[in-house]
Structure formats: C-alpha cells, structure tokens
Amino acid sequence: MKDLLKFLKAQTKTEEFDAIKIALASPDMIRSWSFGEVKKPETINYRTFKPERDGLFCARIFGPVKDYECLCGKYKRLKHRGVICEKCGVEVTQTKVRRERMGHIELASPTAHIWFLKSLPSRIGLLLDMPLRDIERVLYFESYVVIEGGMTNLERQQILTEEQYLDALEEFGDEFDAKMGAEAIQALLKSMDLEQECEQLREELNETNSETKRKKLTKRIKLLEAFVQSGNKPEWMILTVLPVLPPDLRPLVPLDGGRFATSDLNDLYRRVINRNNRLKRLLDLAAPDIIVRNEKRMLQEAVDALLDNGRRGRAITGSNKRPLKSLADMIKGKQGRFRQNLLGKRVDYSGRSVITVGPYLRLHQCGLPKKMALELFKPFIYGKLELRGLATTIKAAKKMVEREEAVVWDILDEVIREHPVLLNRAPTLHRLGIQAFEPVLIEGKAIQLHPLVCAAYNADFDGDQMAVHVPLTLEAQLEARALMMSTNNILSPANGEPIIVPSQDVVLGLYYMTRDCVNAKGEGMVLTGPKEAERLYRSGLASLHARVKVRITEYEKDANGELVAKTSLKDTTVGRAILWMIVPKGLPYTIVNQALGKKAISKMLNTCYRILGLKPTVIFADQIMYTGFAYAARSGASVGIDDMVIPEKKHEIISEAEAEVAEIQEQFQSGLVTAGERYNKVIDIWAAANDRVSKAMMDNLQTETVINRDGQEEKQVSFNSIYMMADSGARGSAAQIRQLAGMRGLMAKPDGSIIETPITANFREGLNVLQYFISTHGARKGLADTALKTANSGYLTRRLVDVAQDLVVTEDDCGTHEGIMMTPVIEGGDVKEPLRDRVLGRVTAEDVLKPGTADILVPRNTLLHEQWCDLLEENSVDAVKVRSVVSCDTDFGVCAHCYGRDLARGHIINKGEAIGVIAAQSIGEPGTQLTMRTFHIGGAASRAAAESSIQVKNKGSIKLSNVKSVVNSSGKLVITSRNTELKLIDEFGRTKESYKVPYGAVLAKGDGEQVAGGETVANWDPHTMPVITEVSGFVRFTDMIDGQTITRQTDELTGLSSLVVLDSAERTAGGKDLRPALKIVDAQGNDVLIPGTDMPAQYFLPGKAIVQLEDGVQISSGDTLARIPQESGGTKDITGGLPRVADLFEARRPKEPAILAEISGIVSFGKETKGKRRLVITPVDGSDPYEEMIPKWRQLNVFEGERVERGDVISDGPEAPHDILRLRGVHAVTRYIVNEVQDVYRLQGVKINDKHIEVIVRQMLRKATIVNAGSSDFLEGEQVEYSRVKIANRELEANGKVGATYSRDLLGITKASLATESFISAASFQETTRVLTEAAVAGKRDELRGLKENVIVGRLIPAGTGYAYHQDRMRRRAAGEAPAAPQVTAEDASASLAELLNAGLGGSDNE
C-alpha cells in the first residue's frame, strides 16, 4: 500500500515554477532526454500491427502499446509494474509514457539547424560575420571554407571553389585546413573565442564613425554577449544528434481497408533515418568522396525539411502533392500548437442551440431546454441520485437518467436551482459576450434569452445560436454569480453608459404611452393618483394620451440619504402617470414627464443606477421591459403604405434642381467651368435638393393638424407609425424614411465615386429599371465590404489584445504629478464633446482653480464623479489636468489613480483589473459592429454639400491663430497660411466655436472684431484651391511652354482660353525637368520680393493647375493667379475609418507627412539643388543651425526670416506620430492619437472613453532607445523596455552615478507585441519561428508576467480573481517558503486506486 501511495503522489504532484527559460540544446542534453536510439525507418508491422523494434514506434524505446502489458505478452497486469521484459525489452508501465518519452538519431554527419541558418537575420551568419550565401554554399557542398590558414596566405573563413582548393593543395600541401559541409561550419563555430571577439568589437565600435558600421557592430556585440551570458555554445546551432518526438504525438492510425493515416512527421523522420543509414554505410565502405558528399547534402536537406519544410528551396510534398507539415508548422499559425491548443481549448459540459425571445424572464434568468439541462447536469444528477439512495451505483443512476424516470426531473429541478450557467454568443468581441444566468427549465429545444441583454451580445432572433457552459467547481459558480451575472453587468465597460437598454418594441411602447394628444378622451380631468389613472384607462374612460392633472408623490434623498416624500399636482398625461407606478422611489417625476425616446430611457436608467445603485436599477429595467411590451402591443403601431407621405413640394424642388443643373451644364459647354468643377457643383446641387426634400418630408410627417376642445385648429406631433418608430429611436432613421417617402438620392459607384444623376424616385413610388440598376452598386458593395471588414476588424482586435494583454492595475497610487490637459472637443460651431464627458471618472493631477481666482475648486487627486463635474460646469472651467495611464509611474502595470473609475462598475478601479484587455475589447468591438452596419442605408451616398463659408452661431469676438494674410484690392483680408484657426470667444473668454480656415478664404471680419450670431465671417470656393499673390506687379511666365509643360484649352463657344499645367507624367521628355511658375515683376522687369523676406515672389504651379491670366498682366496683392481643382469627395463611412484606426495604432508613417521644425529658430533658405530647396533653421542662442532638404513641390508654410518653434508645421500634410513624439513629446502624441481615433468613432456615433485609447498608447510607448549609456550597462542605440531604464536609472542615481539618457520610441501595435519581454506571448502572436529562434539564442527567461503566458502554461492569470493567488505566490517566494505540495489523503488514495484498478480491469477504456 505504501509504495502505491507514493506512486499516486507522483501522479498528482504539480510542478511549481516561476519562470521559463529557453535555450539551445547541447547534444548531451538531447541524449539525456532520449530513451534510446531510433535506428530503423520502419514504423509498425502491417500484419501484426506491432511496432517494429528500433523503429520509429519501437515499444522498447518509447514504452508499451497497452497499459501495463509488454509487447510479447509475458507480463500483464498491475503487479508487474516497472519490470523490464527480458524477451522484448519493454518496460511494463502506462501507455501514456508514449506521449512523453523521446528518442534520438545519431547523425553520421553534423547538419546545420535551419532556424539558426535561414531565419533572418541568420544567427550563424551574424556570429561568423559571413554572408548567408557563402555559408549556404559551404553547407550544401558547393565550396570549401578555410578553417585554419596556417603559414599560408589564405585567410580564416575564406571561401574556396573546387578549383581554388585544388590549386591551394598543390601549392601548400597540408599547411592549411579547409573543409566543406556542416562540419566545416561547426569547426569554425567551435574555434571562436566569444569573449575576445566581444572585446575586439567594442574597441572597433569606439573607433568607428560610420552609422551603418556602428549598427552592424552593435548587432554582433549583442549576439555575442547573449551567447556568453546564456551559456549557449555556438556549435550547438549545428546538430549532431537529432531528437525524435514521442510516437503518440505523431500517431499512426489504421483506417479500415488496411491503409494507415499517418502524421507527416513520420514521413519526414523516415527520410532522415534512411539517408542517415545510407550515409553510415557509405562511410563504412569508404565510398568515393563525391558520393559521400551528395549523401551528406541530402541528409542536410532531409533534416531541414523535418525542422521547417519549405524554408529553403521547394517544400517536400507527400503523395497528394501537398507540402508535408514539419515541426515548425506544428507550432505556428492559427492551427498551430499555441493558438489551437494552448490559448483556447474545447470544453466539456457545453451545449448549443438556437435562441428565441424570453419576454417573461427576469434579467438574471435564461430559459434552458429540459433535454439540454439533463445532459449538461448529468454528473450532478448522478451524485444526487446516489446521495438520496435512489440509485446504488453510478451505472444504475446512468440507467435511470437514460430512461428519463419521473424522479430524475425532480432531481434536475433541485440541481439546477441557484446553479448559474454561462451563455456565450460567437463572435465574443468583448467581455459582455459571455454572461451568467440562472436557468429556468422550459419545454422545446431553443434557449430563451432575455431581450435586454441582446444589445450586449449583439444578438437577434433571426436564427442566431448560443452556447451554454456549466461552471462545475464551487469557485467557478461563485465567480459566475458574483462577477458575470447579467445583473452585475449593467454598464458598458467601453463608455460607462447602461448597456441594458430597451430597444425596438419596448421603446416604441414607452414612447407611445408617454406621448400626449390634443383633445383626447378625458382631457382636463384631475386625478387622485396613478392608480386612478390606470383605472380610468382600463375602463375606457380616458385615453392613454389625455392631458390631465394628477396628484404625484415624489421621494427625494436628503443629506443623510433618507427618502423624503413630497406630493404635488402635476400637469401630465394618463400614460405617464401609469408609467410612474413602476419608477423606483428616489427619482424625480420630471424623468417620465416627457415623451420617452431611446436616449431618454437610457438616461433614466443611468440616473437610476447613479442615485439608487444596482438592485433597484435591475428591477426597474425588468419592469420597463414588461410595460414596454404590453403597451407596444396596445398601440397597434404598424406600417402601411399610406404612412409614407410624399411631400407635395418634392416635384417642385426636383424641377428647380434640374434647372440649376442645366445651367451649370450650359456654363460648362461655354467653358466657364471645368469638367471637374461641373461635376462637383452638380453633386452639390443634388445633395442640397435631397436635404430639402427630406426636410419637407419630415416636416410633413412630423405634425398633423387637429381640432382642439375649443373647436380651433391646432398643430400637434403626428401619430404616424413610421414617424413614431424613427422619433422614438425604436427602428429606422431619417435617412431611411427619406428613401421611403422622399427621394433615394445620390448613389455611389463601387469605387466610391458618386454617380451624378440621383435617383429622384423613392421606394413608395417605385424605381425604374435604370434606377434599380444604379442601386445594385451600393447594395452589393455593402455586402462585400461587410465580409472583408469583419475579418480586418477581428485582426485589429487581436493585435490590440496582444499588445495590451499584460497591463494590469497593480497599485493604488504611483504618486506622479504628471497628467494630460483635458479640454472640450470643438469642431466647427458645435461642442462635439463637452469637458464633463471627458473628465468624468478621472482623477485630477493638480488642484483645479476657480477661473480668474486663486481659490481651489477641486483638490488634487480627486476622483471626478457626476457632482464634481456639475461644479466644474457651474464655474465654467474649460481645462482640467487629469492623471492618465500614459504618464503613470508604476513599473509593470498602472496605478488605480492614473486610471480612475472602473467604467463598468462606477467606482475607482480595483487592483488586479485587466485594463489592457478591456481597453482592447472596447476599441475592437465597435470596429466590427460598424463594419457590419455599412449596408443598412443601402449604399445611398451620404455626402453633405461642401463647406464654402463660415457662419458663426453665437455672438462674440473673433480670434485668429497661426494666421498670415494679405489685403486684396477691395480691402478684405485674404488668408495665405494653411493651418489657420478661427475661434469665437464669448464675453468670459471661453472658446465657443472653432473653425479651420482654408488657404485663400476671404475674411469679412478681422482679428478681435465683434460679430453677431448667424453672421458669415469667411467664404471661399470649396472645389478649387487658389494660388494667391502676396505682392502687386506684373505676371511673368517661367518654364510655361505650350505643348511641353502646359496646354492651352480654348472653349469653342466663348473663345475664352485658359492654360492647364500638365502633370509630369503627361509631359514630353523635354518638359520633364521644367518647373512651370508665375513670377511677379515690377514695371522694370525686376523681381518683386515677398514682404519681410529676401525671396523673389514666384509661385510654382503643380499639375492640373488652371491659369486664366496672360503673360505680362498687371495684378494686385490678394488676387488669384491660378486655380487648382480639388478632388471630389467620396462617401464617408468607417470603411475608410477602420483602416485609419489600424494605421494610427500601427503608427504608420503617412505617404507625404507634414514636415515639422526640428529645432526652434529663424528660417532661411540656403542654396537650392535641382529638385530640392535647402531649409536652414538658425537657433536664436547661436548654436549650430539645422539643415534639411525639402522637395520643391512641397508647399511651405513658412517664409524667409520667420521664427518657428520646435515641432511647428513647415510643410502641410498628415503628421507622422513619430515626429510628434520626437519634437513635441509624449503628451502631444497621446493627444494626437486619441483625438484622431476618436474622430473616426465619433463619425459613426460610437462612444469610447479616452482612457482605453490611452492604455493602448501607453503600450505603444513602452520601449526607449538609449542615447547615452552613462554608467549603466546598456548599449548606445539599444532598444530597451522603458520600465527597465527607469528602474536602472533609479538605482544608479541612488548610488550617485550617472543614469542613462534615452528617447521614447513609438512602436506600432504589431511591433510592440513582438517586442515584449515575454517570448511566449510574442511567439503565440505572430512570426513564431523568428521569435523562438531569437529567444533560444539569447537564452531568454520568461518571467510569466502577462496574462497570455500564464494561460499557456496552464495557470490562473495574474488578474481578476487570479491576482490574489499570484500575490500570495510572490509573498511566499520572498519569504523563502517552499510552496506547499498538494496533500494526498487516504480517501483520495483509495479512490484513485479504485479508478486505476477499474481502468486496468476494463482494459478497453484507455482512450
């Protein structure tokens, strides 16, 4: 019994470990793993099905085929355990050792490991400092390499061809040593003295100045140091012993009909063994050199194919022309070991079925079909049956359940009570895609789902399926109940707003019951309370919409949080009074005393949650749903063709538009406008007409005229069903109604350009053939887009999760005073996002002062909740500095104060929360949503008429920033700068509106002038970009040669002619290098200088520019010299948006980025070269000037002599985030990325909290490049984890030494994921081979800090409920205790023993 216990203990023991190290395996190490050498290529005997001895499946090496039974059958049963049979040499033990015992093959000639050879950069090549081509020629026996030059003139590592080798032999005899093949490379690697080489390289590094050389040297130094420190020996990159995978991991399965299905690895191993044995035989026979050489090359190729098939040369294919799967393919890719088996596994105890509506369920319930429940809860039922004594054995219990006896259903009811199940809908895009519910048993076969959780699951009932999982252990049930229950997930983690929001029918019902109607039955009554209102409605004495007075009792919370009653008479309607009956105490009556649309209902739930907390909100949400469904049914709202009222004005509007189009067409034919301008204008006309039709239609639908009690006519909001559905937010939008009853509008072609003839018909009138045909474009594009975008969005989410997965809240407060300034987002005349929305739930980084005083309004380190935000609004604060994860000082994680509020829970975030994953999901989930939604409007082009003026909305004074302007002949200002901003300032000095003013705009009011609301302050032509002269004089053409750089277009009708500049592609060879330009000269023909500079005024013209002046014309400043047609706008939707988000997170450089000033100083222009100008910035303090060559075609925003600050825009274009980081710092780049990403999502109406984007930015900024190493042991130019540098510098400064200086790096999310400290995480993401090769050479240790690594090694993750376990392990390790081994009690032992004996007796159950 005692040794049996020991045996059991050995099985249950789990290894405790803190880190995983990867390294190269030495030949001795491979031999130590092995249980014997595989000598023959045979697998199994096809007649007896027994494995061949010494073959690939040999039982003597790898273990017995059957449990506790040797191959020849001499020893069977458990009692002979551990005996080695003297006849067949097999150890009697369990079969599962065939999954863990390895073998080996002794290679007759060394072979190079292809990963270290071909995985770029080639490690062997880098170590030997030889080109890969040369090494390959040596390895594959094409040339010789000199290993020892001796006294000859041959260098070590010199490559010799066959002839050169023979010549050298004749000349020097055996003075020198040269070889070919892997043994040569092995000899070279063996003879390297790494430490000496390292010293030598460091000396070289200090002497050299060339950038490329330095890079190469540092690379080599890093590799050599890695070898020295990790204890790897270079020659181990050449294999002399090949390990053989355990046979059960490369199985051979007999199919019916005597054929076998086998793993590709067996074929690959067979080739290696065959070639190896042949080579041994040839060597024994002392065969001619050329034959041996050929065999060695073939062996090298066979080993290559086994390790990584297809990496070099053509992939080896099997019988069916498909490349064989090598060892490398087994671990990489979606089907590889990491992603298929380690990161996600299939689970037991799960089922799936179609979902249907469960409108009578409570929020925490789901309907589970009895059949499913019976199957899922089987183990619990068996246990209960035995416990009750209703069944004697498990087998008997099994029988009872199979017969479905009556008692089984009773037991099932008991088992299921209070036992939550998890429901999951694929794709699980965010954590709300898996929630826990209590099951309610139902008949039928479909799962019933509560309608309010559909939004979180993004589920609908058109055939969606969901999976059910059963949490088995007590801990799992507890977590499901406490954390995952649907009632605990009312707020969305992405934006902190309720996600349990009624939609569709419920909204329509509530909207219908809270609408009021003129002269409804029972109008003017005074009622004693909601109860009476309901009685009157039920008995038919009053209409739901009747305007009445009702006595209402409200409850308000006082200072102590006690509820105080307050009764008053309210003007309201019957329906609202009835709805008041379900509103929980503590909410004001105003909340229901309005027509409730979807937004109002959401706000109502939000208020309820903030004031009353979780439980009342859940009950309220359920009540809202029941009520909504009931009254939606009563409303009888339905859609009939007569509900689509076509406005009378439609015909008139369309004929006006057609007239305008005809006029433009005429102008085009008479040459007044170009084709491009005509197209743009036509589209604008139709876009405007469309807006007018839809406005007329909405006005028409919106109101109806009724007779009131006094017999007068009165307008009231319409009860048209379609209008009610759209107005309440239940279904449909103005854009969709426009297509039903207005006009379908402009359509887009598949390439995104807009077709200029719109569809003037609507769906009610019906489309003709042409219109229908045009419509198919958009509809088809929508569907095609959807398929593509879903994949792209999923991939974006995967990259985001990967980069942020190890970010967890690890401490309460890091104590930093850093933070980012938050200001409201103002676009045009609207505040797109007020300050309160941006700072809500953040922590202040410094005291917020009352504007204009020194009084502290909000102290530092305050979590800004709703009440604080109200205070900020009352005092009109317009900038607050808040803590941010980007500036958090915690190493390996962030602190709770820098993160702020946990959006899904409404209080400050807890330690151990995996904020990285939440952030990634919050950004990734809407990406997919939006892309799936593109086709709902059916591809109708949604393009606003182009902006052509600025009209302010409020009164105030104008403030212009970064402006340059000239006064034109009529005394107006013309803007000549490119990023001018016009702000409207109110009397308190707050910015109310902000606009971008384009180049060439004419201003009606100047800087500092007062304007009235509704006044137009600037206008411009939206379709062409002018070239404006800043000086007066005469025009002189340069390089404008007809037929070479320009063509003259004369209009037949008007005889007006204009010059069009040719694109360089269209020019003749002679015109390629010419630069057409307009020069301004004075009457004497001398150059006129641009004011304030000593540059002549000449304006280079880009291709397609149109000039309507003649040579020598007189002009005055502010006049237009030429017009450049702008490309017409395409349609805007997230199709452009998703790639934009991906570009931002990948930190890609835009094609032609803006050029920013590298230093502050005065601008001047140096000597020009052919196509470039030389820009020189001279600092004011007299240090070295900075020079940069800029292509001439770039339009510059600066003039000679102008003063620029570091980071100012010199030439327009999209800004590259790397430049912003380098020149303006971390906060600027954070602001840039956050705002740009938010712009894309805001366009789609998706709310995401800024925090989430900041979390990702923090991860993108986690590397730093060492500029100067100081006393640290970093290398200059080395890229290191930012936290590492911080820690090292802290230690150095504590010892009074000089820290390293560094610059922060911005990495794209893919790069950042691959550059993590953890090689396991990186390998399971992408480029598995490269990551593992690099890690093995460097002998990396993975500290298992992140979530992914811990999932892969099969542990609890260091976040959430697993956080405590990890903290505990760290504490124990620090205290130096050994972690307690699992205790085995006698009961456990006997139970395990019984199980083993059963297995032994059954013998057949060994699956």
Swiss-Prot record:
Q: What is its EC number?
A: 2.7.7.6
Question: What does it catalyze?
Answer: RNA(n) + a ribonucleoside 5'-triphosphate = RNA(n+1) + diphosphate
Q: Which residues carry this modification: N6-acetyllysine?
A: K972
Q: Where does Mg(2+) bind?
A: D460, D462, D464
This protein's record includes keyword Transcription: yes
The record lists Zn(2+) 1 as bound by C70, C72, C85, C88
Record-level Gene Ontology MF annotations:
DNA binding; DNA-directed RNA polymerase activity; magnesium ion binding; zinc ion binding
Q: Which GO terms describe its biological process?
A: DNA-templated transcription
Any keyword Transcription? yes
Could you list this entry's UniProt keywords, alphabetically sorted. Answer: Acetylation, DNA-directed RNA polymerase, Magnesium, Metal-binding, Nucleotidyltransferase, Transcription, Transferase, Zinc
Q: Which GO terms describe its cellular component?
A: DNA-directed RNA polymerase complex
Q: Which domain of life is it from?
A: Bacteria
Annotated binding of Zn(2+) 2, by residue: C814, C888, C895, C898
Coiled-coil ranges from the UniProt annotation? none
Q: How is the cofactor bound?
A: Binds 1 Mg(2+) ion per subunit.
Q: Which cofactor does it need?
A: Mg(2+); Zn(2+)
* Family of the protein in this entry: Belongs to the RNA polymerase beta' chain family.
Q: What does this protein do?
A: DNA-dependent RNA polymerase catalyzes the transcription of DNA into RNA using the four ribonucleoside triphosphates as substrates.
Q: How does it assemble?
A: The RNAP catalytic core consists of 2 alpha, 1 beta, 1 beta' and 1 omega subunit. When a sigma factor is associated with the core the holoenzyme is formed, which can initiate transcription.
Q: Can you name this protein?
A: DNA-directed RNA polymerase subunit beta'
